């Protein structure tokens, strides 16, 4: 088999919404293939879907990979922040690249539109995808900081459909806030950051929406607008449903920008843009790994 025909073999731990949507996206990728889908319950919706697709499944979680390390090259950990810490201890000696879908922040933060090439070049084998709110807000915050690197405070508020927040999301809310705020500081240089997550119970469910507030002294709105629009186009390359709803607008001493994310509807409903954006980001960086290995 030539390099052009080779695909990066992906193992997925976690058969919930995130894991199952990752499975569908992996199977549709020209450069990735899923060789093991591991959860805890063969009767879960995700396991049943994987079985229907002919994917090798296991109800032994991470143990399925530990028992046969050769089964995959890259591992998506779609479990929980607490579980990931233990998973990494077990996977690190196996020389696997692990894409962490949880807010455990064990590895380096990755926002594909900003630093995918940099983090892959660093050789970091634990790649943290931050959070859904981080993936939607940090690119905009980073674009603003490219124009005004001196701003002191940034706040991001993400509103998501309550139906899209599964047990792992709800259990990791404290970790979500902490990880999002730390990543905001890293990618903007802001002295102070604040992250808010709102679970909206509205029916019909709302699309994910994120508003970014940046406190800037004498902001150059025209330059900020140009930088933000360029960043939005960069994101659309791997998140087609990413939209600029409110362009950078001056509100007192704050610059306010709002974006919306509609999901692809691969496995999850379109309103679950919060899950879709972090999964699209994970697929994008893993496809870059494939490109580096096999030239495609």
UniProtKB/Swiss-Prot annotation:
<comment type="pathway">
    <text>Aromatic compound metabolism; 3-phenylpropanoate degradation.</text>
</comment>
<comment type="function">
    <text>Catalyzes the conversion of acetaldehyde to acetyl-CoA, using NAD(+) and coenzyme A. Is the final enzyme in the meta-cleavage pathway for the degradation of aromatic compounds.</text>
</comment>
<comment type="subunit">
    <text>Interacts with MhpE.</text>
</comment>
<comment type="similarity">
    <text>Belongs to the acetaldehyde dehydrogenase family.</text>
</comment>
<dbReference type="GO" id="GO:0051287">
    <property type="term" value="F:NAD binding"/>
</dbReference>
<dbReference type="InterPro" id="IPR015426">
    <property type="entry name" value="Acetylaldehyde_DH_C"/>
</dbReference>
<dbReference type="GO" id="GO:0008774">
    <property type="term" value="F:acetaldehyde dehydrogenase (acetylating) activity"/>
</dbReference>
<feature type="binding site">
    <location>
        <begin position="15"/>
        <end position="18"/>
    </location>
    <ligand>
        <name>NAD(+)</name>
    </ligand>
</feature>
<keyword id="KW-0520">NAD</keyword>
<dbReference type="InterPro" id="IPR036291">
    <property type="entry name" value="NAD(P)-bd_dom_sf"/>
</dbReference>
<feature type="binding site">
    <location>
        <begin position="164"/>
        <end position="172"/>
    </location>
    <ligand>
        <name>NAD(+)</name>
    </ligand>
</feature>
<keyword id="KW-0058">Aromatic hydrocarbons catabolism</keyword>
<dbReference type="Pfam" id="PF01118">
    <property type="entry name" value="Semialdhyde_dh"/>
</dbReference>
<dbReference type="Pfam" id="PF09290">
    <property type="entry name" value="AcetDehyd-dimer"/>
</dbReference>
<dbReference type="InterPro" id="IPR003361">
    <property type="entry name" value="Acetaldehyde_dehydrogenase"/>
</dbReference>
<dbReference type="InterPro" id="IPR000534">
    <property type="entry name" value="Semialdehyde_DH_NAD-bd"/>
</dbReference>
<protein>
    <recommendedName>
        <fullName>Acetaldehyde dehydrogenase</fullName>
        <ecNumber>1.2.1.10</ecNumber>
    </recommendedName>
</protein>
<feature type="active site" description="Acyl-thioester intermediate">
    <location>
        <position position="132"/>
    </location>
</feature>
<keyword id="KW-0560">Oxidoreductase</keyword>
<feature type="binding site">
    <location>
        <position position="274"/>
    </location>
    <ligand>
        <name>NAD(+)</name>
    </ligand>
</feature>
<dbReference type="GO" id="GO:0019380">
    <property type="term" value="P:3-phenylpropionate catabolic process"/>
</dbReference>
């Amino acid at each position: 088999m030539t390099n052009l025909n080779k695909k990066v073999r992906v193992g997925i731990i976690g058969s919930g919404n995130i894991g199952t949507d990752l499975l569908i996206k992996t199977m549709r990728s020209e450069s990735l293939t899923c060789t093991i889908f591991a959860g805890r319950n063969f009767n879960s919706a995700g396991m049943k879907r994987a079985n229907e697709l002919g994917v090798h499944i296991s109800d032994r979680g991470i143990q399925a990979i530990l028992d046969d390390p050769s089964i995959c090259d890259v591992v998506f950990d779609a479990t929980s922040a607490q579980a990931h810490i233990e998973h990494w201890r077990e996977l690190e000696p196996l020389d696997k690249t692990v894409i962490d879908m949880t807010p455990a922040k064990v590895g380096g933060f990755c926002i594909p539109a900003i630093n995918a090439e940099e983090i892959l070049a660093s050789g970091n084998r634990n790649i943290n995808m931050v959070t859904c709110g981080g993936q939607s807000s940090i690119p905009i915050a980073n674009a603003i900081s490219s124009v005004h690197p001196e701003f002191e405070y940034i706040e991001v508020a993400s509103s998501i459909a309550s139906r899209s927040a599964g047990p792992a999301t709800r259990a990791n809310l404290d970790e979500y806030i902490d990880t999002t705020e730390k990543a905001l500081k890293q990618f903007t240089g802001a002295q102070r950051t604040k992250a808010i997550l709102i679970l909206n119970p509205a029916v019909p469910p709302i699309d994910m929406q994120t508003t970014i507030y940046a406190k800037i002294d004498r902001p150059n709105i025209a330059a900020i607008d140009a930088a933000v629009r360029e960043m939005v186009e960069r994101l659309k390359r791997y998140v087609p449903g990413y939209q600029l709803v409110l362009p950078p607008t001056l509100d007192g001493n704050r610059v306010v920008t709002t974006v919306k994310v509609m999901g692809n509807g691969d496995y999850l409903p379109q309103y679950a843009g919060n899950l879709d954006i972090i999964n699209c980001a994970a697929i994008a960086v893993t496809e870059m790994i494939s490109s580096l290995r096999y030239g495609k």
